[in-house]
Amino acid sequence: AAEYKARATRLKKAILLEGEPDRTPVCLLAGYYPATRKGLTPYDVTQDYDKTVDAWLEANHVVQADTLLAPVFAAIPGRAYEILDVEILNWPGHGVPKEASFQYNEKEWMQADEYDLLIDDPTDYLLHYYLPRVAGGLRGFAKLMSPLDMVEIVGGPPWMMRWADPDVQASLEKLTAAGREAAAWGGKVYPLLGRLVAEG
């Protein structure tokens, strides 16, 4: 508890410029360092969640930074991204070598004439335009109608029918499978974060 309080005070003083901290806070965006120090590749920790947890737990204990080294910034659930055919980024073993970090794919994912669509209804825009563009597995969602079409009785059947479309069904199946994989990842990673927070 005393160590946690010292770190919190150090960070608060430095961030809010409230006097001089006892030392410079150590805040690391460690990337894949916790993995590589254990002899693992970035690919390994996008596939084996137990190894991810072990590597990040040990790195936090050894490095003793003032903030958490969290795997959520690097060790993504690779299989979930593969299931959805995510195109907005490449990750270790999928578009970049297994030893490389993830890379964003710079492309015009949002068109210049779509800002009004985004501003008018962000959820509708993301569901019908953006997500189908950035993930091949979600292309079917572009065929869905707005949930607002279900408000009146005459709009109900056409809205419901879209959910039976084979492309929509395929996207739903992929999203469900990716959700299960992300839950398997989260079932390992989030308890680690809870443990590290509890340790102070």
Where are these regions (language model features)?
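Catalytic cores of TIM-barrel enzymes
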Residues: 1-200
